[in-house]
Structure formats: structure tokens, C-alpha cells
Amino acid sequence: MNRLLRSCLAALLFLPALAQAGGGPLNVLVVVNSASRDSRALGAYYLEKHGLPQSHLCSIKVDPRAASISLADFERDVRLPILAHVANQGLAGQIHFLVLCLDVPSRVEGNNGLTAALFYGYKPPTPNAPQCHVASNSVNQYFGSELAYTATAGWNRTNAPIPFLLTAANLETAKQVVDRGAAAFATFPAGAFCLYGSADDARNIRYRTYPAVARQFALFGLSALLETNAVSSPRPPRPILGYVNGLPNLPTNLADAAFAPGAIAEHLTSCAGMIPDPCLGQSSVWDWMRLGATASYGTVCEPCAFQEKFPDPMIAFWYARGFCAGEALAMSVRNPYQGIWVGDPLAAPFAAPPSVVLRAPARNAELDGETPLQISVAAHERGAPPVYLDLYLDGRHHAPIARPFAPVGNELVAQVGTNRFAYVVAPAEDLYAAAAGLAWAINAGGAGQITASAKADRVEIAVRQPRGADGLPLPFAVSVEKGFAA
């Protein structure tokens, strides 16, 4: 049996113990429907709770009662006004998330989720394909990336932000979602991620992935946060941090369950995102918002039971690592074209942001000419020294202060038994490239007996014969040796 060995580079590179959420309030554009009083009120409330300036508020005008919008109207009345606002307000390059507030259509042409169409373009049904199929060219390149999201990275050959519908059955509930999203940040709440199942064979298709998710939690020492049950959905024994199951309707035992601020919850069924229309009596994303979730996902039309059209249960692990709800949900769905992401994308209960203090100039000081800045930065007690620093002035991105590049020439080494594998960091490589390089070195020299895969900021190593001739486990170690430019 193979033994999985995790190369623990945490203390040897500058790998955070928990990933940092990729966006903050100044990376969000709030979009309101000028034809809806509730939408305008919710947008103003979101700005207030997250401390956003007015330049981050964009108005569009669509029928507030429409459930769907034509592709032509979507381009003219939704996408183009958003792009124009970003350009006119000098926000280009810094908007990584969109929050569309209440009373906007949930779908485009009745068969694409509005957020998906904004994220990576409208995906028409494949010609001559059966009703149950996955549309061609609908793979989300951000899926499973485990990287902080920036729109300018060019995911899916676009520069599009991750869009969320901030929606609920009424304005009051929607405001409560905002409250929970704002309250969740960096709280590290106690509770459980619940990966549950059911006897519904058509919908209970994700349980096979639960052991792989549990393994990742174990490798990071987070097993206490995870509850799994492949065949039923019991009442969660602790506050819900995340919830996954496969049922058309939410279990009645959730009626009095506790949801931690920031909780992501969803269920695999036909049309949980077909709001405001009812769908075969099934529960919807609105039901999750009412119960206490902060983010969710649902499909806007019949997707059939394709697992790739729904969140991968690894979403629990990614959220626990510190990604925000927007990133965790967006990287969890391989083919999201028929779905909508719902709630507050900024919710990030496991983010570990650094403390940043501006030492000079003094607050409210009058400045004239060039002024040096004095900034002190300290790592979060659960995080690591920061590697990304950006300067914003008046709500707009002004300049990057620091970027994470691995020291050129440093040699990353993994030792498995008597086998030594090394990779020398090249110029302009970051941590992720360095991890990929080490994995390449292991695969090139392991003769198929020792293999490795790079997963964002870490490397996982598998050994076919994990014991030596003496029957004992092979010794394993990793190190960084300073190179010519250390």
C-alpha cells in the first residue's frame, strides 16, 4: 500500500500556515438595480458594513421582477454598465468580486446563471447534445486552483471578477446575510464542516470524495473541524461552518441548528438557484439564507446529476485554509454555467490577515510634495509573515509594496530514504512555481516509485515501497539550502 508523505515546506519557504483570502472590501464592486428600492437600500447597507467608498457603488437598470434576462439585454444592461463604471472610477485592475444586490435576474436566457455569465461568459447548450449534458467550453479554469483570486490573472481568458448575488426572500434577511459576512472575518469559529449524504441515489453522488477531503483535513491537523456521514444527514452536533448534502429539500433537523457567521451551505438538487420561481417544491438558496448561511450555490435550471456542476466537497478544506467565500465557491465548481453563487463573497472566518499600522505621516496631517511612508507589519498569530502588500489611496489601488518571490538560487530538497531530489529556484518564481519545480524534480528522478504532485503552495509525495529492507518506514525530510542569491 502506498503511503502518502506530505512535504512540509511551511517553515522552510515562506508558506503561510493558512492561506490568505485574496480580496478585501476595496476589491469589491457593489452593483444595485436603480429600479428597485430594496436593491438600492441593500447596496448602501453593504457599503456601510464593509466600509466601502461611494466609488465602489455601481447602478444598473433592469426589470426588478424578471427572473431571466435575454443575452442581448444582459450585455447591454448588466455587463457593459459594470465595465464602464470600473473604467470611469479608476478601479481597473482592483475589482476581484462583484456583489449584485437583490431584485436582479437570476439567469440569462433561462439556462445560464447570471453570476456564471458574468464570470466567464454565456455558455449555450451544445448543439445536437442530449438534454443531460455538460456544455462544451464550460470548464472553469479557476477550479481547484487553491490560489487567491485576482481578476487580472486572466482566469478563463477574461479579466472578470467573481460575481455573487446578494439575495434573500426579503430585504431584512439579506441585511442579516451582510451582517454575518462582516462579522465572520478572521474569527476562527468553533464548529464543524458537515459533509453529509442521503438515501437519494440520484443526488447523493459526492460522498465518494469525502475520504479525500478528510485526508487533507488530517494532513493540516484540522480533523476536529470535519464531520462526515455518507448515507444520512443528522442534525449537526456543533455550529455549522459548512454544509453539503444531496437532497431536494433541506432536512427538518436544520430548523433549530446553529450556523456560525460565514457558513457556506448548499444541497445538490435540480434548481435551488431558480429564484424567485418555485421549482418542483424543492428548497432553494433562499432557504439557506433564512436558516443562517452566509453563502450558497444553486442551479437555475435542470442540470442533471453531474457532480462537476456542483461544489466539490473540497470547498470545506479550502474555506478552512483561509480563502474567502467568493474564492472557495468559485474554485469548487468545475462547470458552473448553470448555477449562481449567492451571499457575501467577503466572508472569511479562517483568514489570518497581518496587522498593518501606518506610523507616518500622522493621521490628518497636511502633506505637500513627496512624502515617505512608514509602515509596520506584523503577522497574525495564526498566520505567517505577509508576502503581499498593496497601497490604496481614496479607495483606489495606488501601488504594490511587496510581492512574493522565492529567493533566486535557493535549492529545495526532499529526501526520501536514500533518494535526494532537488530543485533550484529560478528568477521571478514565486512559491507556487517553486513547489511545482520540486514536484517536477521528484517525478523526473523517482523512476515511477516515488511520485509527487504540486498543489498550489505544497507538494504531496507518494512512495510505492514506503518501508525499507528493515521493515521500518523510510526516513523523510525536506530542507532549503541557500544558493548563489540567498
Residue spans for each PLM region:
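Bacterial N-terminal signal peptides that target proteins for export
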Residues: 1-9
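Compositionally biased, intrinsically disordered/low-complexity regions enriched for serine, proline
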Residues: 3, 13, 383, 463, ...
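Short, intrinsically disordered, low-complexity terminal segments
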Residues: 7-8, 14-18, 436
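Cysteine-dependent hydrolase recognition
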Residues: 14, 21-388, 396-397
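Long, compositionally biased non-active-site segments enriched in small/hydrophobic residues and glycine
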Residues: 386, 390, 401-406
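Extended, beta-strand-rich, solvent-exposed assembly scaffolds of outer structural proteins
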Residues: 402-486
